[in-house]
From Swiss-Prot:
Inhibits thrombin-induced fibrinogen clotting and factor Xa-induced prothrombin activation. Binds to thrombin and prothrombin exosites. Expressed by the venom gland. This is Snaclec salmorin subunit B. Pfam families: Lectin_C. Residues 32-142 form the C-type lectin domain. The keyword Magnesium does not apply. Ca(2+) binds at S64, E70, E142. PROSITE patterns: C_TYPE_LECTIN_1, C_TYPE_LECTIN_2. Disulfide bonds join C25-C36, C53-C141, C118-C133. GO terms for molecular function: metal ion binding; toxin activity. It comes from Gloydius brevicauda. It is found in: Secreted.
Length: 145
């Protein structure tokens, strides 16, 4: 009897330990390093995709990459699920946070940008490219678990 309790307790400890190794993501989301990711099979403009991601889960946004390994994980996920395609990620110049300065050191007081650009990746590699944010692409949402 004592051996049965010991073995049962040991199995419980192993189960609890293993269940904590991945992020606790909702059904349909994939986990990696404490974050949850979901690819959406619909195309949208960047701003609409970002808004959609914020509505999917508290703290949700378009995916942001903080390491080569994370980017490789998401790109592989995109290719496995969709084959070839382009996917928005959360990088853009929409908020115009860059500190532009004229070569004569004058501050930028007048702007006439032609386009606002957002960044996407292809599901065939993890190289980033930019295109007009008004264009449509698939997208990946992410939140921290």
């Amino acid at each position: 009897m004592g051996r049965f309790i010991f073995v049962s307790f040991g199995l419980l400890v192993v189960f609890v330990s293993l269940s904590g190794t991945g992020a606790d993501c909702p059904s349909g989301w994939s986990s990696y390093e404490g974050h949850c990711y979901k690819l959406f099979n619909q195309q949208s403009q960047w701003a609409h995709a970002e808004k959609f991601c914020t509505l999917q889960h508290t703290g949700g946004h378009l995916v942001s990459f903080h390491s080569t390994e994370e980017a490789d994980f998401v790109v592989k996920l995109a290719f496995q699920n969709f084959g070839h395609g382009i996917f928005w990620m959360g990088l853009s110049n929409v908020w115009n946070q860059c500190s532009w300065q004229w070569s004569n050191a004058a501050k930028l007081k007048y702007e006439a940008w032609a386009e606002i650009y957002c960044v996407y990746f292809k599901s065939t590699n993890n190289k980033w490219r930019s295109r007009a944010c008004r264009m449509e692409a698939y997208f990946v949402c992410e939140f921290q678990a």
